[in-house]
Every structure is written in structure tokens, then in C-alpha cells.
A protein has these predicted regions:
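A short, conserved, highly charged catalytic patch centered on acidic carboxylates
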Residues: 1-107, 115, 119-125
Length: 126
């Protein structure tokens, strides 16, 4: 399993822990931190125009939590987030919802905010 590293990750984890320590956060409370992580990582790779839309409009195929844009009105991927600490991403990845999403939305990342799955690629923050 690969590991994320670098400044964007440090800031992201610091924000995650701050939100978690409040004790009353819902899944959506972590969305700004996740969007910022992806934006920062894109910038580190010279992709300064990447835009993240949290909770985009619903489509016929469903509604992943995020859409990732290339800055030129082309969707380059999607992110489906589950609550922080969700340990059964493998089970979730085999659910009807995720099967439908994968068949409809290319480049779908499944995450619990510390583990990220894109197809057979699994990356964790720890």
C-alpha cells in the first residue's frame, strides 16, 4: 500500500484532527479539508486549474460527494467519501452504490478520509 506524504498531507491531517476533536462533526464537516488536500496536491504537480465541487448536483447515475474538474470544464474524476474511521472500505467498495458509481463515473476514488481507493490502488495516510 502506498503512502501519501509531504506538506499538503501534514496540513490535511492537522485539520482532520482539529475537526475530529470537536466531537460533533459529521462526514460533511471534513469535506473542506479533503477538497483542499486534492487542490494542494494538484498544485504540487503543476495542475493549478483543478477545481473540486463538493456535493454536486445529482445525476441519473447518482451523486458522488465530489467532482474533480480540470479547470477547463472537463470532469477528470469523482470522490465518494465515507465517515472518518470507516474500516470496511472493501465491503463498501463492493456495495450496489459503488458498483453503480464505478460503472457510471470514471476515476472514482473511495475514501474514509485516511484511506483512498482508486480501483486496485490503495493509499493510506498512516
Amino acid at each position: 500500500m502506498a503512502k501519501l506524504k509531504g506538506e499538503p498531507l501534514r496540513g490535511y491531517l492537522k485539520t482532520l484532527f482539529a475537526v475530529l476533536s470537536q466531537g460533533d462533526a459529521r462526514e460533511e464537516s471534513f469535506y473542506p479539508a479533503l477538497a483542499q488536500l486534492f487542490t494542494d496536491c494538484a498544485q504540487d504537480y503543476g495542475r493549478t486549474d483543478v477545481c473540486i465541487t463538493a456535493q454536486p448536483k445529482k445525476t441519473e447515475g447518482g451523486n458522488p460527494d465530489f467532482r474533480v474538474w480540470d479547470g477547463k470544464q472537463h470532469i477528470i474524476g469523482y470522490i465518494e467519501a465515507k465517515r472518518p474511521g470507516e474500516e470496511n472500505l472493501q465491503v463498501i467498495s463492493e456495495s450496489e452504490q459503488l458498483k453503480r458509481y464505478r460503472s457510471t463515473f470514471p476515476n472514482l476514488i473511495l475514501t474514509n478520509f485516511t484511506e483512498f481507493r482508486l480501483g486496485s490502488i490503495h493509499v493510506t495516510c498512516w
